[in-house]
Amino acid sequence: MFNQKNVAFVITDPQVEFLKSTGKGFGATKDVLEKVNTIENLTKLFALAKERGYKRFISPHYFYPHDHKWQFKAAGATMMIENEMFWRDSQYSAIPEGSGADMIEEIKPFLDEDTIVVNGHKIFGPESNDLNLQLRKNGIDTVILAGMNANLCVDSHMRELIELGYNVIVVNDAVGAPGEEAYQAALTNYGYIANQVLTTEEVIAQL
């Protein structure tokens, strides 16, 4: 059984861009989202985690005007920046309601003082944000990981957190991916790298 003292949820990119039809990445992810009921399962996890007192860490994606000035970019970053995905006009202004950078409405009721939104990760993994620091300062050594995209940000967070010494459980039906091939590739990697791979219902049974 999990416990609230040293176990927390880490959710990558639970934002409009890949999860809702108005998002610029939704066309690539919608089939897998529908197949595994990603939004429904993420909502279940958020709701029960709040009810039972588990901390929730969100590692979001944001891009700003200054990111356009990067002198070199990898393919994924180039695509996102050129299409102004996860876009914010400024670090000093609020995120526009319903924009690609906004959190999906389904999880907003569960965002409270036990939800820690860390700095945005810039490419795929948490190396460039404060996720590790926040987890350590909160006494967390076990992470239940879910979110978007299964083969990119979720995979990269899993790898880095494993390297940092965390016990990482990936929730395989609370993720989404840009197509079935990408989803299956992610599942293969989870099986080799994560400490455990569980379904939403299997996680809920241990909360």
Residue ranges and their predicted role:
Residues 14-22, 56-58:
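Short N-terminal secondary-structure initiator segments
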Residues 19-35:
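Acidic/histidine-rich helix-loop elements
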Residues 39:
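Glycine-rich loop(s) and the adjacent beta-strand/alpha-helix scaffold that form part
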Residues 54-61, 171:
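Short beta-strand segments at enzyme active-site cores
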Residues 61-62, 121:
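Beta-hairpin (beta-strand-turn-beta-strand) motif
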Residues 64-68:
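Short catalytic/ligand-binding loop motif for oxyanion handling, primarily in non-cytosolic enzymes
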